[in-house]
C-alpha cells in the first residue's frame, strides 16, 4: 500500500517544529503523526490546547492539514475505571445505556436517552469528564432500536484498536508522501456499471494516484461471471492491483451493486488500503454483505468471501460526514455530499491537483424531497466533470408524482385487504422499505390501516440502523423525533418476523396482512417464499416499488408472465401460477427519473464542462447523454465498460 515514502519523516519533522512554536508548552506535546487523512497531535494536557479557541484553526491554516488533538495514550484511565467515573459524574437522569471506548482515537462514546444531561449546562459535565478520565467524550442519543450490526462494528474497532492505529499511520504516510509528479493528466476507466445497472466500479487515475469509486456485484447475473463482477481483466486495473498502487476506495452507498465486492479484495489480498464512506454506509454495507453470503450459503453456492473478510473491510474503513474535506492522496481531496438515495448515500466530489480538475460522481441519487431524505446536493465549490446515473434516463422514464404514488399505494392495499387478501411488497432492506414504512405509518395513525404490517428479512435491522443516524434523515422526521418526541419507526403496527416458522404462519393465516420483505427484485430472501405461496391466490396483490433489473424474477413478474418456473432449494423446478394482482408504482424509487435528471443538470453549479452518463441500460445512457447535449450544449459521453476517458 505504501509507495514512495521518501521525505515523509522530514515533512513531519518540519511540522513538529512549527507546532512546538505555536502550541503552549504546558500542553505537553508527546507525538505528532499522520493518521489517515488527519494530522494528529498527542498531548499530556488536552485542556491547555482548548484555552485558545483559535489555536487549532490557526494550526490548520498554517499547515494546510486537518488537525486532530488527542490525549496521549499513557494518560488515559483504564476503560473500566473511566466508565465507573463517568457514571459518577453524569446524573442518573441522563439514563446512560452504553459506554464504549475506541483506543485507536482516544475516544469514549457515551450513549444516553437524554444526551443533554451528559453534556451539562454550557458543556460543564463534558469538560469535567475530559479532565477526570482524559478520554475525549462523544455523546449520542441512544438508538430506540438496538442494532446488532452497530454493536459488532464498535466491538471490532475496539478490539482491533492497535492494528487500526498502525493502519491509520500507514495511510497517513501514503497520503502525505512527497509527490513525484505534478498532476498533468486525469482519466477515468469504467470497470462496471457503464451502459448497464449493476457491478458499479470506476477507476480514477492521475500521473500520481489511483482511486476507485464503488466496487459492486450484479446479483442478478451471478451465474455469468462475465456480467456479475467488475472487470478485473482491465489491464490498468490488473496492474494497479498487482503492484499495490491503489490509494483508496470510495463507496457512494451501501447497496450491493456498489459495495458488494469489497470483501473479495481482502479475501485474496488484492488491497489493504483505506475505504472512505459515511458512517451509515459502513454499517449498512456490513449488514448487506453479511446477508449476501448467508443467502449464497442457503442456495448451496460457495460464497465469494467470508465473514472475516467483511471484518477486514470494517477495519479499513474511514468514515466521513457530509461536507468534511479530506486529503486521500497527494493530489486528490475528497468531499462527500448528500445524494438523497438511501441512508448515508453520497455524491463524491474529487478536487484534483490543487485546482487542476474537479469531478462529481453522483452514484445513485434523488433530486426531490422524500419522506426519508432531503434532495441531492447540486452546488459544489468547483466542477468540471459530472458523472451521473441514468437508471431512469430514457425519454419516457417519468415516475408518478410522489403524492399520486402514495395515494395509489393506499388504494391497492385497501382494495386487497377489503377482499381478504394479503399484500406483498418486495423491497430492498435499505431505502425503499423504510420509505414505504413511513407512508403506511402515517396512514395507520389516522386509522386507515388496522392490520399488522410484517417486516421480514433484514428490514428490522436496517431500520434499527436508520434510528441510530437521525441527523441523516429528512428535516420532517428529525423534527418528529427531537421536537415532538415521536419516532414513527416505533409504531406498534410494525411486526418483525423472527424466523421461517413465523413466516409460514403468516402465509397460512386466513387474515389479511401487509408484508414488506427482502429482496426487492425477488432474487433470494423471504420475498421469494412469500411470492411462491401467495401468487396463485387472486385475492392477493404484489406491489413493486423499486427498479427491477433485467434477468430477475421481479422483472418477469412485472412483465406479466403468468407461469414462471422457479428452482427450489432441493434443485427441482416448479412452475408458479401467478394469479395475484401485479402492480408497479414507480413513484417510490430512490433514483431520479428523467425529469429530475434533466432538472439536476439545469441546476447544478458550477455548470460542468462535461457530463458522462452511467448506471443505466445502454439505450437510457445514450438517450440521456444526447438529450443533455441538445438542450444544454454541454459535451456528453455514454461510455461502455472498459472505455477510458481522458478528462485533462
Swiss-Prot record:
Residues 590-648 are annotated as: Metallo-beta-lactamase C-terminus. Residues 9-76 are annotated as: KHa. It comes from the Archaea. Transcription termination is stimulated by the Spt4-Spt5 complex. Dipicolinic acid inhibits FttA-mediated termination in vitro and inhibits growth in vivo. Its cofactor is Zn(2+). One of its GO terms (biological process) is DNA-templated transcription termination. There are about 2100 +/- 500 molecules of FttA per cell; RNAP is estimated to be present at about 3000 molecules per cell. This is Transcription termination factor FttA. It comes from Thermococcus kodakarensis (strain ATCC BAA-918 / JCM 12380 / KOD1) (Pyrococcus kodakaraensis (strain KOD1)).
